[in-house]
UniProtKB/Swiss-Prot annotation:
Location(s), subcellular: Cytoplasm
Keyword Cytoplasm: yes
Chief localisation class: cytoplasm
Keywords: Cytoplasm
Protein biosynthesis among keywords: no
Name by which UniProt lists this protein: Chronic lymphocytic leukemia up-regulated protein 1
Tissues in which the UniProt entry reports expression: Specifically expressed in chronic lymphocytic leukemia (CLL) cells from patients without immunoglobulin heavy-chain hypermutations. Expression is detected in all CLL cells and levels are similar in patients before and after treatment.
Miscellaneous comment as given in the Swiss-Prot or TrEMBL entry: Tridimensional modeling predicts that it may interact with the IL-4 receptor.
Top-level taxon: Eukaryota
Source species of the chain: Homo sapiens
GO cellular component: cytoplasm
Length: 121
């Protein structure tokens, strides 16, 4: 059974510096070690987002491209919500190409959009 308190304390320290690299590391780790149902997955999402939305928010530009495709832990509406990611303005939406999500935004550079497309193909 998923122990919320235990999970919270185990990732609180790694998340304390509130950096994109810590977020990436934690998500990569969780993708390797956690197999759970959708309800538990949702709880994990909320806990991670809560920890990383404290103090200084994560800059979207610092997230690794591959982290955008770890949708088993993060859902796009949560990750892209301006409440949690404040580096870019609202108006982001997402589409699908080759069964993988791609983020589109008028606020992202053309180069970054190209990288996302390239990763998808």
């Amino acid at each position: 059974m998923f122990n919320k308190c235990s999970f919270h304390s185990s990732i609180y320290r790694p998340a304390a510096d509130n950096s994109a690299s810590s977020l990436c590391a934690i998500i990569c780790f969780l993708n390797l070690v956690i197999e759970c149902d959708l309800e538990t997955n949702s709880e994990i999402n909320k806990l991670i987002i809560y920890l990383f939305s404290q103090n200084n928010r994560i800059r979207f530009s610092k997230l690794l491209l591959k982290i955008l495709f770890y949708i088993s832990i993060f859902s796009y509406p949560e990750l892209m919500c301006e409440q949690y990611v404040t580096f870019i303005k609202p108006g982001i939406h997402y589409g699908q190409v080759s069964k993988k999500h791609i983020i589109y935004s008028t606020f992202l550079s053309k180069n970054f959009k190209f990288q996302l497309l390239r990763v998808c193909w």
